[in-house]
Amino acid sequence: MGCVCPQDAKNNEARNEFYQNNYEIEQKIRTNKTLMKCLIKLQRKVKQHYYRKNRKNLNNENEDEPLTYKHIATNKIDQKQLEELFKIYPPLNDDIDVEVRSPAQFSNKVIYFGEWDKNKNLRHGRGIQIWSDGAKFLGCWKNGKACGKGKLIHADGDVYDGDWVDDKPSGYGTYIHSDGTRYDGEWKSDKQNGKGKENWPDGTSYEGEYVDGKKHGYGIFKWADNSIYKGHFDNNNIHGKGIYAFADGREYNGDWVKNRLEGKGIFTWPDGRKYDGDYKNDKKEGYGIFEWPDGKKYKGEWKNGKQHGIGEYYDPDENTWKKGVWECGKRIKWIDD
């Protein structure tokens, strides 16, 4: 094989290795810190919602306490709200004989005003329920439980508006947090299940599939700086095949394991550089090919993000490949065939 001028080759290799490793560090910081910050924020918001919902069962806050009630003064419930509710939601028309009663206060201090099943003495039809902390539900009831369309306004200002089944959000609904974070999509048994979209006040968004309240399946996550990930999620983690496009033009297309680059992947830079090969724990490791925009190439072994082991270096000016040994990103020696 032909030879390369030793000093020029070393200078070029050193410069190229520096740029490549510098971008590797930037990429690692971006992936681990910015990405995880958004994912944790999303997961925390969802968990807060579940805790509030579990604390505030629509049927009875204390299941061991008998569901007794007493009539209270009508002025404690806004009569106009009930009238508006009747305009929004039509009668159930399920052949149940219902009647509108004056407001009733249960032994747990929950107040209900609306329609009742006359025979079973259960909330049934359209009604308003208010908790002692100011939380309020306006919507439809069946057999004593929230069922159908309804809106739950939490004491802290959070709002869920959508479908209900047996006191739990199920079907399609919108949840708006007091800070402006919003979810529109499908629910099942009080958890996000199916397809949905979340939006944050800073412009961050996620649209895709959910299972039991977590991102699971295919989804698209966009950051406020216009970075975007399109691919698979598993148990609220980026996991599987996916493409991450950085705001500065860099792009990674390949395998992910729990929010980290791991497996086979292709990483490209806007200036024309490209790496195609193995990754482990966010770093190049295994076999890979690195190409520079001036035509130079390295193919061979990598470890901890650097050339390490036996590899081949291509010089386009000489149109030659030369085999060598690299250690921690530096060429140690050439190997003569």
Regions of interest found by a model, annotated:
Residues 1-337:
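Intrinsically disordered, low-complexity repeat tracts enriched in Gly/Pro/Ser/Thr and acidic residues
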